[in-house]
Amino acid sequence: MNQKIWDLYAPVYEKAMRLDRRYYQYMYDRIPAQISGKEVLEIATGPGLLAKHVAHPTKRMVATDYSEGMIREAKKGSYPAQLTFAVADATTLPYPADSFDVVLIANALHVMPEPELALAEINRVLRTGGLLIAPNFVGHGTGILSRICSKLLRLAGIRFEHQWTESEYLHWLQTHGWDVTFSKLLPSRIPLLYTECVRSYAWTEEEMCDIMTPTNRNL
């Protein structure tokens, strides 16, 4: 999706998220225990709302977004000292291999044309035994409210490249090398599937190249 769209919506994005605050509260309550004492990378942080709520027990947390406008918004206000914000593209992360214990990417994979590229980078920077937390919208258009919200977002220029159902999203993660250890469906305006994953096994470079071939990208 065009970076300029996210720059445009950066000043109002947090206000829109507040409409689903009670469902985000579930993540605010659960995630800190999963990342306590860990080095954490967040991808697609947006205005940093999730990062600011969960970073306090971490050893270090880096929250990134490829929109400079979003990062400018994220840096406003107060947040834990161990939290930093940076501009970074999820498909070409500027971090060495095995840099983080946990990677968090919330509500972003479905708007990426090739989310497999982001998964490959997550696989690269995540340490052995690390955790991927990947909540994502599922079931677009399955209910009246969901259909209305999806249509409004499309009119605003925010396009869903992938419209997974709950089972399709879980299958997609599995076919790309991740075992889902925990999931919970949250009935927000567009249903949100909270997921925690670990690698199904250590992928070799050859296997990662195979997973990235065009014929396999939409599995």
Walk through the language-model features, giving the residues of each.
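Conserved acidic residues
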Residues: 38, 59, 101
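C-terminal alpha-helical "lid/dimerization" subdomain adjacent to the S-adenosyl-L-methionine
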Residues: 16, 20, 133-193
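Core SAM-dependent methyltransferase catalytic element
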Residues: 176-178, 182-219
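Class I SAM-dependent methyltransferase SAM/SAH-binding core
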Residues: 41, 45-92
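A short acidic, Gly/Pro-enriched loop at the edge of an enzyme's catalytic core
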Residues: 91-102
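Conserved class I S-adenosyl-L-methionine
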Residues: 1-35, 49, 53, 73, ...
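A short glycine-rich, Lys/Arg-flanked "PGG" loop and its adjoining helix->strand segment in the class I
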Residues: 116-128
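A short SAM/SAH-binding and catalytic strip from SAM-dependent methyltransferases
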Residues: 102-114
